[in-house]
Amino acid sequence: MIKNISNLGDAALYCDFGSEVNKEINSKVIRYFKSIQKENIDGINNLTPSYNKLIISFDLRKKNFQTIKKLIENLNITNDDELETNRIKIPVCCDENFSLDIKRLEEKLQITRDKIYEKFFGKEFFCYMTGFIAGMPFLGDLENELQAKRLETPRVKVPKGSVGLTEQFANVYTLSLIHI
């Protein structure tokens, strides 16, 4: 299930599940994450899951890379284990003054504002991870028709609560972001 386990500095290891971003690979990452949490392995300090990677930080005074690697390789992880999920509704306001990129999206994607909203709100998203800024969900599997490239020059300020569409993800900014 894990394609490669390698050092990440002297007190962490990097579990690589592949380069694709999809639910199947992300589910493997989460299964390992949950299993390691459940095992409560002495010496493991922190687990950081992402789309398709898992970083495991450990205390060098208690365990070394080879010991942690062997523990991870010997975990009995199956796809049969049901992953617990929660459905969360996130209210979104699309008034003109909150829709920072709607005109750009209409032009780039060659579809109307109503069609953008219809496609966006007509879908349930899968949360691949939270991060970048505190608690920011990376909601995946955005319809191809809604996928847009990142801005060439990032906004100087992104207000808290903004929803960004970037490539295959929708992100909800949990904090205001100011680029300096």
Describe the function of each predicted region.
Residues 1-178:
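Glycine-rich active-site loops that engage anionic ligands at enzyme catalytic sites
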